[in-house]
Amino acid sequence: GDLPIAFPAFMECVKMGMPIKHIRPTHVGRHPEVFAQAIAFTKAGGYIDITTSGGNYMGSAADAFVMALEEGAPIDRITFSSDGHGSMPRFDKNGEMIGLTVCKVSDNLKMLQELAGKIGLEKALLPLTRTIATALCLGNKGVIEAGKDADLLVMDKDLKPLHLFMKGRQVMKDSEVIVKGAFEE
């Protein structure tokens, strides 16, 4: 978030014995001082999360990711999340909150499309695949290997979803969801 005092508190926890891998700061792109501390946190071995649903002082989440890399953050210590379906404040031109909107999971895809144009698709996929799976200790996720969950998204040349498989089961075909959950129509 916006609290510059958060990272010193995190590092005190680490000094007292808490494994740095269990501390997961998010919304780290909202304030320049917080962002600088977040980059230092990655260099100490921690993970940071950049929110794709807006709120990054330097622009988009892709801009924040590139800036973090330029400042020396290890690429395998940065994850993305959308705060999918969480509430997000809306502000007027004077910075006054005027209401709420909803964060969209699709912001992750928009960020991937933007970031791929900046650093290439292979690197752009990392914060949404291998890095987040590793950070969350999800050993069967994040990579395509024998013996792992067969989660696979097939996209077209414009990085728009065509087919999706979850644990080997096709749930999207030709850009249409074919398997729905209990709360979907």
Model-derived features with residue positions:
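Proline- and acidic/polar-enriched loop/turn elements at helix boundaries
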Residues: 1, 53, 126-127, 145, ...
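Short secondary-structure boundary/hinge segments and terminal tails
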Residues: 6, 58-59, 132-133, 151, ...
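Flexible, glycine-rich phosphate/dinucleotide-binding loops
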Residues: 32, 57, 87, 134, ...
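Short C-terminal domain-edge/linker segments immediately following a structured domain
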Residues: 54-58, 80-82, 109-114, 157, ...
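His/Asp/Glu-enriched, well-ordered alpha-helical/loop segment
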Residues: 70-146, 152
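C-terminal cap of metal-dependent C-N hydrolases
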Residues: 144-185
